[in-house]
Each structure stands twice: as C-alpha cells, then as structure tokens.
C-alpha cells in the first residue's frame, strides 16, 4: 500500500508520527508546503520541509514543533553579541540544514534534489517532496492604520504573531509554478491521498494552488482531516485566515474549502452534528492528538476506514 500525505505546519506532522508507526515508511510519500519559505541572511528557511524531515527521523523538538530536540544555540547567542538578535531562535544543527539549502539554491540545485540529499543524509525511507521547485510565496494582505500592507506569511506569523486585521491571502507565482519532480508520480501511484490536519489556507492552500497538483488529486481517493474542532482551530491562525477567505471556521468550512477534491472528511467525534452540511463521506474519530497513542489510533482509524470501503 502506498499513501501520499499533504503536509504543512504542525498538525500533519503529528499524524505522520502515527502513520510511520503502523505502515512501512517506504510506503509513505509526503508533499510539503513551501509557501512559507524565505531567506534570512545567509540561511534559507523552509520550515515545513524541515519539520517533516525531523519528524521522520525522530529528531523533532515536539515541544515547539520547530527545530531539533537537544540542539545548542551557540551561533544564535554569538550573533546577539554582535547586535543581531534573531526573532526566530535557530539551533546550531538546524542552522546547518538551512545553510545547506541556501548554498545549494544559490548554486542552482533544485529544491527537490536538495530535500532528497537531506532525506538520504538522515537515512529516511519515506519520500519527501517540496510542492514545487519554483518559489510560490504565501502573502497576507492586512490593514493597519487604514493602510493596506502585503506581508510574507513568515513576517505575519513570526514578527507580528498573527496580530493584524487580515483582508486576504495570496499565493504569489502559483499560476506559473509546476509540481516538483516526483510529486505527480507519487500521487498517481498512491492508493489514497491524505490531507493532514494543517491550516487549510496557508499550509495546504499553496500546494493546491498549483493546478497540476490539484488536477491530479481530483483523480484519486482523497481523505482530509479537519484541523478545526467545533468552531476552534486546534492551533495556529487557521480561524483568522479562513474568515478572511470567506469560509466559516468549522468543519463545514473545511469541507467547503476542499470540496472539489475530498472524498472522505475526518472529523472529531464532537462534530457529529456537522454531517448534514457536508456532502461527502465522513469518518468520526478523536482528532485531538496529545499522545503518541492518539496519533497511532487516528492513523489506524483512517487506514481501517480505507480498507473497509
């Protein structure tokens, strides 16, 4: 059995932790959001790619869901002495990965090749693909003091902590971007696709904004796990961003966002009253993943439902 997972943010990596315990890792492919990627000085941040790499290698700092557990911060502290105070605290080993990306990109190496080098360096059996080798940037249009300002998502979330009146979200360059090498083949060869419980707008939306990928998904069986329980996102700015795009902050809003491609929507048990407004199959489960057992159970519920169809 082969499955392909669409991932971004922190919700989907938690579910990946469950899947990698119950199926052979070589049967898992992951297509990862790169809409939040950005340069900071001489390093290249690709937060969602790095989180997936660290998740599969059991190195992820699962308290912050960013960077490596047990990392040191010697470089970060030294930069502070020079008056360069990084808003995002980057560990030394994590910085090396980001330096590798920056150097490779400047030398013309495609992102898909860079990620594969890093994957192999960590001895990972699962395939990990950036959504595109071309830059597609998530931009957030905000209003501040009656002025409209267009921000990179990184600036909106890291520097401003999401504290702004959001008017809209755009995926810059998505009209021209192509799927990265291996992405379409992974989709076509999968038994089913899983959209993880990530922010639909800025974690999954950039992937779907590439028409080549979205069209390929329409030909496959697609599961999607709602990242919203009741009327509250499990984490992050999903509520604010869904409102800005005109979707209700609920499982119904998640369905409306994915309705062109989703066949089975996975909802939390507490959202049983939402079924009447959802026009696809619904699987109810505990989608709040606090422990490894929660993650494994949710992964197994999805797998069992697929096998029973």
Swiss-Prot record:
Associated pathway: Cofactor biosynthesis; coenzyme F420 biosynthesis
Species of the source: Methanococcus maripaludis (strain C5 / ATCC BAA-1333)
Chain sites annotated for binding 7,8-didemethyl-8-hydroxy-5-deazariboflavin: 50, 89
InterPro entries: CofD, CofD-like_dom_sf, FbiA/CofD
Protein name, UniProt field: 2-phospho-L-lactate transferase
Domain of life, source organism: Archaea
GO terms, molecular function: LPPG:FO 2-phospho-L-lactate transferase activity; magnesium ion binding
UniProt EC number: 2.7.8.28
């Amino acid at each position: 059995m082969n499955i392909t997972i669409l991932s971004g943010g922190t919700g989907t990596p938690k579910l990946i932790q469950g899947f990698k315990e119950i199926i052979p890792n070589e049967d898992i492919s992951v297509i990862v959001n790169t809409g939040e990627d950005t340069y900071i000085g001489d390093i290249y941040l690709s937060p969602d790619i790095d989180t997936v790499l660290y998740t599969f290698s059991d190195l992820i700092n699962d308290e912050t869901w960013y960077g490596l557990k047990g990392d040191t911060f010697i470089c970060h502290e030294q930069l502070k002495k020079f008056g360069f105070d990084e808003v995002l605290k980057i560990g030394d080993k994590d910085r090396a990965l980001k330096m590798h990306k920056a150097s490779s990109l400047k030398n013309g190496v495609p992102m898909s090749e860079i990620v594969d080098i890093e994957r192999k360096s960590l001895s990972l059996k699962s395939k990990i693909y950036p959504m595109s080798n071309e830059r597609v940037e998530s931009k957030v249009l905000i209003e501040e003091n009656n002025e409209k300002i267009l921000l990179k998502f990184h600036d909106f979330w890291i520097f401003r902590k999401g504290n702004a009146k959001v008017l809209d979200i755009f995926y810059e360059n998505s009209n021209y971007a192509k799927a990265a090498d291996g992405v379409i083949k992974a989709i076509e060869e999968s038994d089913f696709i899983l959209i993880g419980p990530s922010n639909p707008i800025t974690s999954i939306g950039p992937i779907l904004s590439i028409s080549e990928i979205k069209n390929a998904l329409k030909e496959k069986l697609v599961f999607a796990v709602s990242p919203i329980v009741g009327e509250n996102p499990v984490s992050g700015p999903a509520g604010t961003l869904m409102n800005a795009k005109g979707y209700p902050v609920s499982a119904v809003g998640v369905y409306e966002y994915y309705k062109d491609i989703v066949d089975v929507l996975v909802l939390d048990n507490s959202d049983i009253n939402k079924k009447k407004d959802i026009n696809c199959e619904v699987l109810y489960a505990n989608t709040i993943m606090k422990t490894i057992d929660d993650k494994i159970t949710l992964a197994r519920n999805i797998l069992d439902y697929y096998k029973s169809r």
